[in-house]
Amino acid sequence: MIVGIPKEIKNNENRVGMTPAGVNELVKHGHTVYVQKGAGENSGFPDSSYERVGAKILATIEDVYAISEMIVKVKEPIAPEYPLIRKGQLLFTYFHFASDRRLTEAMMSSGATCLAYETVELKDHSLPLLIPMSEVAGRMATQEGARFLERPQGGKGKLMGGVPGVKPAKVLVIGAGVVGYSAARIAAGMGADVTITDLSLPRLRHIDEIKPANIKTLYSSEFNIRAELPTTDLVVGAVLIPGAKAPHLITRDMLSTMEKGSVLVDVAIDQGGCFETSRPTTHSEPVYEVDGIIHYCVANIPGAVSATSTLALTNATLPYVVQLANKGWQKACSEDEALYKGLNIVDGKIIYPAVAEAFGLPCETI
């Protein structure tokens, strides 16, 4: 198979879809790999590192799309890429369709096969291609939230861990999955007073058994969240319904109960955001204010630490990339139920129920 690795063009997206080690594996299996010039530079992989393992370097993104049967990316295609995608081409990347009707319609019109990292699902309901980036995003959410609590960044000037004689910051994490617990652990490590909420009592029970002393668990409800907000300095939204649009768990009227200069970090922004007042931001303009509350809603948080996150992502994706290249997507997906669940759009048809439901469109089967 001919596999293409384009350079990511989303704002400050520094990751790359495959490392030289991954290219080496594909070449060993007899596949041809084309890499766009400079695609890996911001993750620490110069063109020469790809050439040494057998990749061919192409000058433009147009060249990569034109020649490749399978495109391996990190983030969803954006508007300049839409005309480059053709019928029958396989795209393997994060899509997050449920929050983006324009992207969904563009991919349906293209006739391409869209296989989404975020909905590949194992029998135990874990999401193996989402977990590594969730771990990174959770850690980064707390780091960035702590930064924007600083006065020069517009925050209330509060130190996460406090000092002797001064209370630490209060952190509320909504959602106790991989993102949420990663965020809570980092906040606890910084010395903050942390509360983590979830609807799953078994999950909260598990966290209660392994958590440090400064993390408390709380059942997630509108009443409980509303009660926490007046004394909370930093909120991390870490809600996930696989493939579906995130619910709004903090509404605009709740902001008035918070102190000015408090910070909301919405890690669920890829799926539409879990705060009513959320809208996507970028690494170059990461925050905005609503009613005196700072909102950090960067849609590709791990792109800021690309050297780490590219390795973490490709460690997880490579076995699936090799399967797809060796067998073709039809055979690979028919033999691997987890991979089959990654199929979102095929030949103009939505086949993932949560995406169809998000837009009131029919869900087909293949």
Q: PLM features: what roles do these ranges have?
A:
Residues 209-291:
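Rossmann-like adenosine-cofactor binding region
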Residues 118-144, 148-159, 269, 274-366:
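Adenosine-phosphate binding glycine-rich loop
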Residues 2, 8, 77-169, 298-300:
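Glycine/serine-rich phosphate-binding loop and adjoining beta1-alpha1 elements at the start
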Residues 69, 75-76, 95-96, 221, ...:
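Short glycine-/small-residue-rich Rossmann-like dinucleotide-binding loops
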Residues 6-45, 152-237, 287:
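Glycine-rich phosphate/diphosphate-binding loop of Rossmann-like nucleotide-binding domains
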Residues 5, 34-37, 57-59, 65, ...:
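General beta-strand structural signal in soluble alpha/beta enzymes
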Residues 2-110:
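An N-terminal-biased, well-structured beta-alpha scaffold segment characteristic
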